[in-house]
């Protein structure tokens, strides 16, 4: 009789294309910045996701707002002070000149593969 570990080994050999969920690592987890300051948030994928990355802004009690898609494409109506860059595994969101309304939590999301996975978020607060 085979043990569960042996069955798992056989399954992994049988299905070489099986992948783990893509992990998205955001940094920093929180930051304080002054008005007018340039702010950059990073997001790293555990594997190549091409440019299939979206950035969201979340404010308390409100629905998430999509800022950029395909890593660097600005959604209509989003101010041009927001920009995105990167491809493959390393991405960043930059706010060129911080405004008060930019405070909130920012999330990256990969949509290269299912299940879609989010970064843990970056809380952006005003430096006093």
UniProtKB/Swiss-Prot annotation:
Region: Framework-1, residue numbers: 21-43
Annotated Gene3D superfamilies: Immunoglobulins
UniProt region (Complementarity-determining-1), positions on chain: 44-54
Residues annotated as signal peptide: 1-20
A Pfam family this chain is assigned to: V-set
Disulphide-bonded residues: 43-108
UniProt xrefs under PROSITE patterns: IG_LIKE
Location of region: Framework-2: 55-69
Protein name: Ig kappa chain V-V region T1
């Amino acid at each position: 009789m085979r043990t569960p570990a042996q069955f798992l080994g056989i399954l992994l050999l049988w299905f070489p294309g099986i992948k783990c969920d893509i992990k998205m690592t955001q940094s920093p987890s929180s930051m304080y910045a002054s008005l007018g300051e340039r702010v950059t948030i990073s997001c790293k994928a555990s594997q190549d996701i091409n440019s299939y990355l979206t950035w969201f802004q979340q404010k308390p009690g409100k629905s998430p707002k999509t800022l950029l898609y395909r890593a660097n494409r600005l959604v209509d109506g989003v101010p041009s002070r927001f920009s995105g860059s990167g491809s493959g595994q390393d991405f960043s969101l930059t706010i060129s000149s911080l405004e008060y309304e930019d405070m909130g939590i920012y999330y990256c999301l990969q949509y290269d593969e299912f299940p879609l996975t989010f970064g843990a978020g970056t809380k952006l607060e005003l430096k006093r």
